[in-house]
Amino acid sequence: MLSRISERCTAVTGLEQVLCRHVWSAAWLRDAEPAAAASQSIDLSCLMERAGLAAYDVFASLYASQRHWLILVGSGNNGGDGYVIARHAREAGRKVTVLSMPHSKPLPTEATNAQHAWQAVGGTETMINPGTSLHLPTDVDLVVDGLLGTGISGPPREHYEEVIRHINALPVPRVAIDIPSGLNAETGEAAGACVKADHTATFICLKPGLLTGQARDYVGQLHYRSLGLEEWMIAAERMDAALCRRVALGDVYGYFSTRRSAVAHKGSCGKVVLIGGDHGFGGAILMSAEACLTIGAGLTRVLTRPEYVAPLLTRCPEVMVTAVETETSGQLEQQMVEAFEWASTLAVGPGLGTGAYGQAALSAALQQAEMHQDKTLVLDADALNLLAERLHSKEMGAAVGAGKYLPVLPNSIITPHPGEAARLLACRVADVEKDRLAAARRLAAILGGTCLLKGPGTVVHCQSSGKTAIVDAGNAGMASGGMGDVLTGLLAGLAAQRMMHDTFDTTCAAALVHGVAADMVAAEDGRGTRGIRATELIPRIPFIVNASVPSSATQQRPSGL
């Protein structure tokens, strides 16, 4: 069933497939390019030639029937790549129109050399005049974006914005060199106009802005090419410089290659307690419980309101359910003491509410988790909203200043969506989305554990190890109620089984299963992403966690950086 899903990033060689599981900052690459070229005994102009040819090969294979290419070149080395592509397209017999942006400074040396090589084969270009209407040939059937590269931060300048908006409106395919113009290579922010590419060819290493933030609206299918630098990039010095991991479809086999022991029993496969489901919110805790069971937890117990006992047992008779009658008599606190003594993993939040029940549950969970540091505590949904209230409570001002108002819980996992993240960080949602990696680091520091920041290009960060990952799975169909509740169940159930190396790997693996399950639903019989329900993910989970390793697979168990 996994074979129905396409990888979001293509790579050709085995080493490229390894390298595209890692992400480096664009700034690091700019500094490293001279050494990369020197390792091949070539100069930067030759490296640009490799990049342009690699991009041309990708685009020509995708659009073999497109005969008139419009190539837009900017004033930097991204434009230099465009000149190389133009030359190869012309030499292959295609009609090529090159439009260049005005620039007040000379082109970089490498771009100048590429421009001269284009002119040497008879190529011409037309400079775009700001403020004048952009007139394009009517028979153009492919647009190649070489306007802005990986160095941009903030919105494109006005005349670049005008050109970008114009080409986005053209009814023809668009492809981007290295990164779509207008997209921040470090964060995935599109602060202004941004080219909406159908395909993007990127070189030497993946950059975070291609994978998270607003990237999925603009990058299209990603194609990674190492330009012959695989051996240089795979060396320890370069791997140690990587910013984070990219967790993707192929990692399923690494995470779940270990089969369950033939002599396993329910007690050895993990015990989970889920706490939630206040009055009116029973569906959330039910979905969490079902997901927890389906990913393989040995025993699952739920603490919830009395009215949800019967529905839970009807839907999931395998679950043990305890009714929470009242939160004022100490009943819930005692139940939480017993839960932490019994379980290996606890999750608080699905359908919890922010009333007295939720407040009592969170208080008891934090207190018990501090006393049971070996247990994993997952906090989601209203548990996070209540945590934010604690964090920013005026009554706790003195404690906030002293840093003693929340315990340090290295085995905790928080799973905020951008709205919950903004409340935890006392900022705007836009501030979270502006730099999701930075936000995840700040969020993980709140309890000293692991943060899973939801959204396209989910970001996972572990405070204690410093490891970060971007989970490149899932789709827009996950923008519906209940998805987070399913994820909470997956996290709790997987953590309880102690299959992974650490909490970071557990969090990455659960997020991957969640995203791949949604991709499986979308891929079935041309289903698509609109109208996917959270409960539809659950039946797909066993096919993911029990996936057989393909005979050609070379993936090893993923490890964080």
Swiss-Prot record:
Residue span of region NAD(P)H-hydrate epimerase: 1-241
InterPro entries noted in UniProt: Carbohydrate_kinase_pred_CS, CARKD, Nnr, Ribokinase-like, YjeF_N_dom, YjeF_N_dom_sf
Keyword terms, alphabetized: ATP-binding, Isomerase, Lyase, Metal-binding, Multifunctional enzyme, NAD, NADP, Nucleotide-binding, Potassium
Residues binding ADP: 454-458, 475-484
Region annotated NADPHX 2, chain positions: 417-423
Annotated positions binding K(+): 78, 145, 181
Protein name: Bifunctional NAD(P)H-hydrate repair enzyme
Protein species of origin: Leishmania braziliensis
